[in-house]
Amino acid sequence: MSFFRVRLERSAIGLSSKVRSVLHSLRLTKRHSVVYCDVNPINAGRIFKVKELVSVSTVKQKLAAGQEKKSLASSSGFTVIHRYNNGLKELNNMFES
């Protein structure tokens, strides 16, 4: 089964109550929030009404909230290869005795 992955890109501040009610019916309340909707004509019509505010893609399966957050996160720019915990323990033992 396919799903629409809908992400709210722009805020509904200052827009008509009709647009805000459509966003509410799609369960989009905050910017950059993501919802998954079934692919059907009703949801397609709702998305079409707010097409200027959202980004839409079709996916095969829903992602969990944690997976969604990880996919949006940027890389840190470095990787930790080794931690120097054993050396610190030895230093602490030397100063304690």
Curated annotation (Swiss-Prot):
- Which Pfam families does the UniProt record give? Ribosomal_L30
An example of a GO molecular function for this protein is: structural constituent of ribosome
Give the location in the cell. Answer: Mitochondrion
User: Keywords, A to Z?
Assistant: Mitochondrion, Ribonucleoprotein, Ribosomal protein
- Keyword Repeat attached: no
Please give the coiled-coil regions recorded for this protein: none
A GO cellular component annotation in the UniProt record = mitochondrial large ribosomal subunit
SUPFAM superfamilies recorded:
Ribosomal protein L30p/L7e
Instruction: Please indicate which superkingdom the organism of origin belongs to.
Output: Eukaryota
Give one GO biological process term. mitochondrial translation
Q: Which InterPro entries match?
A: Ribo_uL30_ferredoxin-like_sf, Ribosomal_uL30_bac-type, Ribosomal_uL30_ferredoxin-like
* Annotated function: Component of the mitochondrial ribosome (mitoribosome), a dedicated translation machinery responsible for the synthesis of mitochondrial genome-encoded proteins, including at least some of the essential transmembrane subunits of the mitochondrial respiratory chain. The mitoribosomes are attached to the mitochondrial inner membrane and translation products are cotranslationally integrated into the membrane.
The similarity comment for this entry is:
Belongs to the universal ribosomal protein uL30 family.
- How is the subunit organization of this protein annotated in UniProt? Component of the mitochondrial large ribosomal subunit (mt-LSU). Mature yeast 74S mitochondrial ribosomes consist of a small (37S) and a large (54S) subunit. The 37S small subunit contains a 15S ribosomal RNA (15S mt-rRNA) and at least 32 different proteins. The 54S large subunit contains a 21S rRNA (21S mt-rRNA) and at least 45 different proteins.
Protein name, as recorded: Large ribosomal subunit protein uL30m
Quote the gene name from the UniProt entry: mrpl33
